[in-house]
């Protein structure tokens, strides 16, 4: 599901330049249905791909262009937070800043979140960040830059576990039994070509946890 949600965000979350409203598509219906049945407002993918009042600013494409032109740039940042539009969103974005740095040939990503549900949100946020790093590294290699995936640093201003998920949280903290080494196989697609599939996990057999999203 993380791949499909990332694709949903990278593709504009079902919005268009002239209709800047994120919509729940079949790819993310299970994840986003607690908040809405259809429209979510100008959130995530709208800010990423159809920014500004007229919807013409493509932040993802802008960042890709900056990194392709100069991988050492310190200006490769996109955001999902626009204060004047937060009131029109069904839920304000939790991760709000994605800042890129290429240092020593390694593609690094810093994600800053205003709020993080450690049980229901953090696993997706960090996995999607890891996938973004691989996608960006693929893009830069396609343009002749000798880079490899680097580090993901995730920072949150408010990490929390809701009371109804404390039991799940305690079980998640228990050491997992690993019978075989887990191998993650990244896709060869780039950021702008990603179609929501291609990443694979081999020998991954984690327990299934049932946690409830808290709508606040």
Where does each model-flagged region fall?
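Terminal, non-catalytic protein-protein interaction segments that mediate quaternary/complex assembly
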Residues: 1-216
């Amino acid at each position: 599901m993380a791949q499909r949600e990332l694709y949903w965000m990278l593709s504009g979350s079902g919005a268009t330049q002239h209709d800047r409203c994120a919509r729940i598509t079949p790819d993310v219906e299970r994840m986003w249905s607690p908040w809405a049945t259809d429209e979510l407002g100008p959130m995530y993918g709208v800010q990423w791909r159809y920014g500004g009042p007229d919807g013409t600013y493509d932040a993802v494409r802008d960042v890709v262009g900056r990194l392709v032109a100069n991988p050492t740039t310190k200006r490769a940042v996109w955001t999902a937070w626009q204060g004047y539009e937060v009131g029109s969103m069904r839920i304000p974005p939790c991760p709000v800043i994605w800042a890129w740095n290429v240092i020593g040939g390694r593609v690094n990503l810093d994600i800053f979140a205003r709020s993080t549900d450690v049980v229901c949100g953090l696993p997706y946020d960090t996995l999607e960040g890891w996938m973004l790093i691989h996608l960006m590294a693929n893009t830069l290699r396609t343009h002749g830059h000798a880079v490899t995936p680097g580090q993901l640093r995730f920072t949150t201003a408010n990490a929390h576990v809701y009371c109804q998920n404390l039991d799940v949280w305690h079980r998640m903290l228990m050491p997992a039994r690993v019978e075989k080494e887990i191998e993650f196989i990244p896709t060869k697609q780039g950021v702008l070509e990603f179609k929501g599939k291609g990443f694979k996990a081999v020998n991954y057999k984690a327990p299934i946890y049932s946690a409830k999203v808290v709508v606040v």
